[in-house]
A protein has these predicted regions:
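Hydrolase catalytic cores
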Residues: 256, 279-283, 402-468
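Bacterial N-terminal signal peptides
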Residues: 10-23
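Catalytic-core segments of hydrolase enzymes
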Residues: 255, 295, 307-410, 455-459
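C-terminal subdomain of the subtilisin-like protease fold in secreted/lumenal serine endopeptidases
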Residues: 183, 305, 309-311, 440-493, ...
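Aromatic- and Gly/Pro-rich amphipathic surface segment
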Residues: 68-115
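Autoinhibitory propeptides
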Residues: 107-186, 192-195
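Subtilisin-like serine protease catalytic core
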Residues: 30, 48-50, 68-69, 150, ...
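C-terminal outer-membrane/trafficking sorting elements
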Residues: 489-499, 503-573
């Protein structure tokens, strides 16, 4: 028996939420001449002696280790992930859920940068890069280091996140008691139809990246909070704190209310029953550039906590050109696509530059795996400020539209205050909440399935363009759509149950009567037979196994059950 025969028909058991898989062959920095972005090149020519900027330093590799040591390091890295994160990754990447991209940066490389006297901002294991603050001389020396692959300037935010305030929608369509003035923004994208079916986002974990969050507002009294982190000050306080600009947490508070608000008769969020991860990633201070590196750090953090959806009302264009909006150039776009590869649905605002000289979407909205949200008014007409596509390489953007004009939102000026505001920032959490409902209804769906469903059922699905994308999101219709390839993703075959999930030291296997005759066999990843266990000759059977099986090292084992699908079991002790 060859282990790979079981991989195609596997059920996953997570033991203590920890995973081991082969090291993989992820490439991080291409050999050859270093690539210095044009913006850094121009700065090096004109910078004064003491002037400093934020720079991404990309490394060529993550250090030279023997294969066995590399596998052990990946195993240790995987052990820090929430069981929900492991399960999500196994659905998205069943053959290689973890690889070298999940390893921390190589410490000797960081020590070499530290020796140059630079200030570290943050680190990205996915990009194999560190963001630093350096002057001209330091930048030149770092560019000459042999392990450095490339340098790129850290980008700033595209425009202000502050919404336009409007008194009322273009036309008041009507209200229902429960939803109050938030009725239309939810009804337009068919969220109410899913609420009526009982879907509120329960059990779905949503991460939101923004300027901060004031949870003292009444609409968050029932918030199911999993974790929060301030990436600017590196603490767990996402509300305003000493040193923050006035209004720092306002934009994030308003966006979160569209997702998680629970004020019956006033405001209800699209996914008020979901679990939330809050990341404060944007500093609104005028004197300090608001940059993409904290967004990337937040994405890696949210991934480790088991986020299934990222809602980001932030986008970045400083130091980029339209040619960079190709889905491959911006570091933040690469990170967003990596999150999607890991099974997270990334929902991002298109931007509010539709009527500006830069009229296009901004990173990471150019990502091919990113759901990009444009804005319409209450009548479904595109907002003039909504940034447009296509991407530089010709892909249709935005993906879909939602109401982003005169939205009814929580007002951070008071614990029971509400207001209206506009921007693609507000279309985004509505769509992210709707997608959380889709994932509650279809827990096996992956990002690609979600994208297929919402584009196939949007109001302009038959004629997408660079202004509306595939049209206004129709969440209920998407929930009734059958994306391709879903059946092959079922990791819970009938006739075989492994539990508890997760477990610490032992697990049980329940087999139905419909199986072949013969022993249960246990193999390691090389195909070596570790053990055989006799089964009852017929009828339903329960087999209790201890994770400390003789000869079983931490990592993956495979179970072969006669006449049934195999099982892939993950063990760490």
């Amino acid at each position: 028996m060859k282990p790979h025969c079981l991989l195609a028909h596997s059920i996953v058991l997570m033991l203590a939420g920890l995973l081991f898989v082969g090291a993989g062959t992820a490439a991080f920095g291409a050999a050859g001449p270093k690539a210095i972005s044009p913006s850094i090149g121009a700065w090096l020519e004109d910078a004064s002696a003491g002037e400093k900027i934020a720079i991404w330093v990309f490394f060529r590799d993550k250090g030279a280790y023997p294969q066995r040591d590399m596998e052990a390091r990946i195993l240790r890295a995987a052990s820090s992930y929430d069981p929900r994160a492991v399960e999500r990754r196994l659905r998205a990447r069943p053959d290689r859920p973890f690889d070298k991209s999940d390893l921390p940066l190589y410490r000797p490389y960081l020590e070499a940068l530290k020796a140059e006297g630079v200030e570290f901002r943050t680190f990205s294991k996915w990009l194999n890069a560190a963001s630093i603050v350096a002057d001209r001389a330091q930048t030149g020396r770092i560019a000459d280091l042999p392990f450095v692959a490339s340098l790129r300037r850290v980008s700033g935010r595209a425009g202000s996140p502050e919404p336009e305030s409007l008194d009322a929608p273009t036309k008041e369509v009507g209200t229902l008691y429960l939803y109050g003035k938030s009725w239309r923004q939810l009804q337009q994208i068919q969220v109410l139809d899913l609420h009526n079916e009982g879907y509120t986002g329960t059990g779905v974990r949503v991460a939101i990246f923004d300027t901060g969050f004031w949870l003292a507002h009444e609409t968050f009294s029932g918030l199911n909070l999993i974790a929060e982190h301030d990436f600017i000050n590196n603490d767990s306080i996402t509300a305003n704190q000493p040193g923050d600009p006035a209004g720092q947490h306002d934009h994030g508070t308003m966006c979160l209310s569209l997702l998680a608000g629970q004020s019956p008769g006033k405001l209800m969020g699209a996914a008020f029953g979901a679990e939330y991860i809050l990341a404060k990633t944007e500093d609104i201070a005028d004197e300090r550039p608001v940059e993409e590196d904290w967004w990337i750090a937040a994405a890696e953090w949210a991934d480790s906590l088991g986020a299934q959806v990222i809602s980001s009302s932030l986008c970045y264009s400083d130091w980029y050109t339209y040619a960079d909006m190709d889905g491959q150039t911006a570091p933040i776009t690469n990170a967003a696509d990596r999150a999607a590869l890991n099974g997270i649905v990334v929902v991002n605002a298109a931007g509010n530059s539709g009527a500006a000289p830069w009229r296009y979407i901004a990173a990471p909205a150019d990502g091919d795996s990113v759901i990009t949200l444009g804005s319409v008014d209450s009548l479904g007409v595109r907002s003039s400020f909504s940034s447009q596509g296509p991407t530089y390489d010709g892909r249709t953007k935005p993906t879909v539209m939602a109401m982003g004009q005169a939205n009814y939102i929580a007002d951070p000026s008071g614990a029971s205050a509400y207001r209206r505001g506009s921007g693609t920032s507000f279309a985004t959490p509505l769509a992210a909440g709707a997608i959380a409902l889709l994932l509650e209804k279809h827990p096996g769906w992956l990002p690609g399935n979600v994208i297929e469903a919402i584009t196939a059922t949007g109001t302009r699905a038959s004629n997408p363009d660079s202004l509306y994308g595939w049209g206004i999101l129709q969440a209920y219709d998407a929930s009734e759509y059958a994306p391709s390839g879903i059946a092959s993703r079922d990791i819970r075959p009938s006739g075989l149950m492994v539990y508890p999930n997760p477990c610490l030291s032992s697990f049980s296997i329940n087999l139905s009567a419909t199986r072949g005759r013969g022993p249960l066999k246990i193999y390691d990843v090389s195909g070596r037979l570790l053990s055989e266990l006799d089964l009852a000759p017929e009828g339903p059977t329960q087999v209790d196994l201890n994770a400390a099986l003789p000869g079983v090292a931490p990592g993956i084992i495979f179970l072969e059950i006669p006449g049934s699908r195999g099982a892939k079991v993950l063990i760490l002790r």
